[in-house]
Each structure stands twice: as C-alpha cells, then as structure tokens.
Amino acid sequence: MTLADRWLLPEGVDEALPEQAAKIEHLRRTLLNLHESWGYHLVIPPLLEYLDSLLTGAGSDLEIETFKVIDQLSGRLLGIRADFTSQVARIDAHCLKDDGVQRLSYCGSVLRTMPAGLDGTRSPIQLGAEIYGHGGVESDVEVLSLMLQTLSTAGLSNLVLDLGHVDIVSGVLAACNLNADQESKLIELYKAKDLPELDRYAEELGCLTDIQKQWLVGLPRLCGGKEVLKHATDLLGDVNESIRDAIVLLQKVSDSICQRFPKVGLHFDLSDLVSYSYHTGVIFAAYVPGHGNAIARGGRYNNIGQVFGRSRPATGFSTDVKALVALTDIVVNKPKTVLSPICSSDELWQKANSLRAEGYRVVEVLDDICAGDADFKLEFVDEAWQLMPVHN
C-alpha cells in the first residue's frame, strides 16, 4: 500500500470534518428532542448482533446489504446493522415487554454493503421512530405526521408525500391465482415500472380472464393525485375486501395529512413495492423537488415481532441525518470563544470552568497562534482574571 492509498476510505464511506460534524450533531439533537416532545423514548441498540437475530423478519434485501463477520469468541456469524427496525422490534418484544402502546426513537450509524440514498453513501446516520402496540389508522397518521414534522424541522420545504398500501398489490395477485414464478415476474415488472413489458407478459398468461388482465395491467397505472383512489375503487373495488379496506384506509390517512399539512403535496402509487415482503399495510415516502430518491420512508409491519415471540402491530419511519444536512442550509450558533493562558493557578482554572458553565468556549493557548476567531481573552487585571475583547 502506497502512502497515498493510506488516505483512502472505502467507496461510499465518508467522514465528517468539524464544520459538517457540528451541523450533523446539531440536527441530531434537535430531531431527537422533537421526538421526545412527542412522547418517543430513545433506545440505543448495539452496532453488532448475531446475524440470525439481526435479519429476523427483515427479508432478503437486508440480508444482502448486511456486512458479516465471524465472532472470535463464539465462532458464530455476526452482522453489522444495515437498518434499525428489527433491532428496535427485538427491544420491544423481548426487553420492554409492555402490553400498552410503546413509542421508541433511535439515531445512529448503519453500514451497508451497497450504496443507497441521495449521495450514494454506505454509511448513513439513520434516525427514526416506531410505534408498537397499535394497529389503527391513528398510529399511521401519527407516524406520518412525525415524519413530516421531522423533515420540516430539518429545514425542508416543498415536500411531496407518496402513499401506497401493500394489500392492494397482494390482493390483486392473490385474486389472479398465479404460481410463485408468475408472481415473482409481475413483482419484478411492477418494481421496474416497465409497462410495455407488463402488458406483453399479461397477454402471455393464458390462465387469466380478461378482467384479471385489466387488474394486473391497470394497477401500476394507478398513480397520481387523490383522484387515484376513485379510479382504484372503480377498477379494483370488487376484487376482494382487503383491497376495499386498503383504499378506505388510504382515504382516511390522506384526509388527515391534508388537514394537518396543507402545503405538503400528495401523491399515490398503488403498485409501490419497496420492501414488499417486509411491510403489511400503509407504506409511504417523502420527496423533495430535484431529488429522485426518497429522503424518508416508512410504513406498517405488523408481523416483525412474531419471530421474537411477541407479535404486535407496528409502524414507523426512518431518514438519514447526513442526507438532511446536505439538503439544507443549517446554521449552528457557535458559542463565544475565549482564549486563556494555560491554567497554572487555581484562580484561572476556576474562572475558565465558570465561563464554560455559562456557555463560553474556553481554549487554552498552547503555542503562539494568533487569536483567529476568538472573541475574548482572559487577562489578569486588578488582581482578578477578567474577560477582555480581542481586536482582530
């Protein structure tokens, strides 16, 4: 390895220098304080867990994204977390064991094998919130509201909220009586939004009736504004009860969000299949103009706690603090800086600590550097250490 190579970081792994680090930490504290004001309790799961526990209920996508190492103590396979959700579900199911509604929040680094997000990072700082123990529309609306408030508090505007429901896709596929390979092919086409290929493939499926073909090819075209829900009712309302219930639920959620956040744009995509095997109800994502990737996303996942022996309804969202910092112009109010001689006396030591307790940033001068951005300096005047202005 050459000297130049020693400076390199792995692709998609970055570091924050002082100015950016101050912005990240300021936003992290601000958003966690916001979540606390909504009644969410902070949890700090470990960065490393046994792989089988870490991936429980998470689906194959997360398994591919997870870095794996061998535990030198036990010989078992460990995983470095790529997402917090299964960890928080384990905490709710195994550690807290509260039968009532539980609100939990988290923030920390995750590591992924493949880049994702606005800047192609593999090391985002994930922040999120979860509600356990409530399966009604009220908790869906609360989590959505907190997500939008989180983004607004971070300084983002012109938000667009994308809504969907996995029961609509699963209901259509179930009603068409397809085999596993056929379902997988359709899910692949829905994810790719490849409408011409979807139309061709639907015609090839000789097992379908004409109305079933209309359901399959019409589903990915159900995207747009609130009129989409009426179109969905017209096209899919007679398929089965689960689809009708999903459309009604989306109507209730969207009505509540429009009332609370009238400036947020609303968009529906009823064939959205992000984390299809993972979520069980309403799914959602937030976007800002000019960026194709979601800046926050979430949804309902009622089955995730079952593998930990305690199945509870759950819903939540997550975002990347570093991505939010990159999208906003965060101003961090810096404390006034005081230059101090090296604290060689008890009086100077007490004065420096007193100023720090008042919110000043007191820096001991270790060499002959210039005052720089300092605002004050400590000088011994009239038998006491006093603040004196620095004239730059």
Swiss-Prot record:
<dbReference type="GO" id="GO:0000105">
    <property type="term" value="P:L-histidine biosynthetic process"/>
</dbReference>
<protein>
    <recommendedName>
        <fullName>ATP phosphoribosyltransferase regulatory subunit</fullName>
    </recommendedName>
</protein>
<dbReference type="InterPro" id="IPR004516">
    <property type="entry name" value="HisRS/HisZ"/>
</dbReference>
<comment type="function">
    <text>Required for the first step of histidine biosynthesis. May allow the feedback regulation of ATP phosphoribosyltransferase activity by histidine.</text>
</comment>
<keyword id="KW-0368">Histidine biosynthesis</keyword>
<dbReference type="GO" id="GO:0004821">
    <property type="term" value="F:histidine-tRNA ligase activity"/>
</dbReference>
<dbReference type="InterPro" id="IPR004517">
    <property type="entry name" value="HisZ"/>
</dbReference>
<dbReference type="InterPro" id="IPR041715">
    <property type="entry name" value="HisRS-like_core"/>
</dbReference>
<comment type="pathway">
    <text>Amino-acid biosynthesis; L-histidine biosynthesis; L-histidine from 5-phospho-alpha-D-ribose 1-diphosphate: step 1/9.</text>
</comment>
<dbReference type="InterPro" id="IPR045864">
    <property type="entry name" value="aa-tRNA-synth_II/BPL/LPL"/>
</dbReference>
<dbReference type="GO" id="GO:0006427">
    <property type="term" value="P:histidyl-tRNA aminoacylation"/>
</dbReference>
<comment type="similarity">
    <text>Belongs to the class-II aminoacyl-tRNA synthetase family. HisZ subfamily.</text>
</comment>
<keyword id="KW-0963">Cytoplasm</keyword>
<dbReference type="GO" id="GO:0005737">
    <property type="term" value="C:cytoplasm"/>
</dbReference>
<keyword id="KW-0028">Amino-acid biosynthesis</keyword>
<comment type="subunit">
    <text>Heteromultimer composed of HisG and HisZ subunits.</text>
</comment>
<dbReference type="Pfam" id="PF13393">
    <property type="entry name" value="tRNA-synt_His"/>
</dbReference>
